């Protein structure tokens, strides 16, 4: 396997493509899977937030994380036949991890209260605790729900406990397993969705590993201030300032590109350092202020140089398939 140049990747992604969520990269989530529903032969459809994308079956989803209304949520399929035993084991593991957190000053214990929740799924437990030793006033909640076909974890924090309780209860009571009959209010997770319209604060991050050492990343965030600068503008500015001396950049394709009625900018470039070349594909859309239908979106792909036509076809097909999830 050819080793990618760390310098080249750092320069192109961080400086030109504007980077991706470090927190999302560090998360280790249970592996989700795609579905062939709605996809062409040999393709899989992946749902994320309020959008969907089709990718060749050779692509594997490595990480998918999402937030809705300030709550971090992800669902998963049970591994064991004895669901009750599995959920108790997972819950105890979570509690053990929470108990190892550093205690804020002035607090006597990490966990404030553990409780069963009624009216949410088939079974639900919640733990209230101090999750940040630097800010002792923040109250964290982690909730674990058994919905039958799937389990779900939710974590959020805040200063107003009643507001947090109302928020996560509303989110969890609107969860549905599967992707049939999606609506404009569907916010998709790994295996199901939350049927709530956009209100505020939504984030999605996904990373895929594909053939020919391709890495595809997708990031979506609601924005409160639309930026006029796109990926092409950042590339031009970086080259003008010689921001990465020693890196030769060959522009293969650049310009405006509309994806799923979302206006944006696209670049396909080749970067070379010390005779090692990599290909970088990127598209972004600035979104609209405070919108779930038009979030700020960044899609990027990096891989070793070579097979440009084949990789470009994969890239174009992926962007052409990107669409609102309700239209799948």
Which sequence ranges carry the predicted segments?
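Surface-exposed amphipathic alpha-helical segments
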Residues: 55-63, 154-192, 296-328
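A short acidic-to-branched-hydrophobic micro-motif
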Residues: 61-106, 153-157, 202-238, 266, ...
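Bacterial N-terminal signal peptides
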Residues: 9-16
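Acidic, serine/threonine- and glycine-rich low-complexity intrinsically disordered segments
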Residues: 153-263
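Positively charged n-region of N-terminal signal peptides that target proteins for export
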Residues: 1-4
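Signature of long, low-cysteine stretches enriched in small and polar/charged residues
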Residues: 97-145, 213-291
């Amino acid at each position: 396997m050819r080793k990618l140049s760390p310098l080249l990747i750092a320069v192109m992604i961080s400086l030109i493509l504007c980077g991706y969520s470090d927190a999302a990269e560090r998360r280790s989530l249970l592996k989700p899977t795609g579905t062939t529903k709605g996809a062409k032969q040999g393709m899989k459809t992946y749902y994320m937030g309020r959008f969907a994308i089709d990718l060749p079956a050779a692509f594997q989803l490595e990480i998918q994380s999402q937030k809705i209304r300030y709550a971090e949520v992800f669902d998963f399929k049970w591994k064991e036949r004895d669901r009750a035993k599995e959920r108790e084991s997972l819950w105890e593991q979570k509690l053990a991890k929470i108990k190892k957190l550093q205690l804020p000053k002035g607090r006597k214990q990490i966990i404030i209260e553990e409780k069963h929740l009624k009216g949410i799924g088939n079974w639900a437990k919640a733990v209230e605790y101090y999750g940040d030793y630097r800010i002792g006033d923040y109250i964290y909640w982690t909730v674990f729900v058994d919905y039958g076909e799937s389990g779900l974890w939710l974590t959020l924090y805040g200063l107003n406990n009643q507001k947090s309780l109302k928020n996560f209860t509303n989110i969890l009571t609107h969860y549905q397993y599967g992707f049939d009959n999606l609506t404009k209010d569907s916010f998709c997770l790994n295996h199901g969705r939350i049927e709530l319209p956009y209100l505020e604060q939504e984030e999605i991050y996904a990373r895929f590993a594909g053939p020919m050492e391709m890495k595809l990343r997708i990031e979506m965030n609601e924005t409160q201030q639309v930026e006029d600068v796109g990926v092409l503008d950042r590339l031009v500015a970086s080259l003008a300032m010689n921001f990465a001396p020693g890196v030769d950049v060959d522009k293969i394709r650049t310009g405006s590109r509309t994806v799923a009625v979302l206006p944006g900018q696209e670049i396909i470039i080749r970067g070379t350092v010390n005779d090692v070349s990599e290909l970088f594909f990127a598209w972004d859309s600035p979104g609209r202020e405070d919108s779930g239908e038009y979030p700020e979106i960044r899609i990027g792909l990096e891989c070793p140089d070579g097979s440009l036509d084949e990789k470009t076809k994969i890239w174009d097909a992926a962007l052409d398939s990107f669409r609102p999830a309700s239209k799948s």
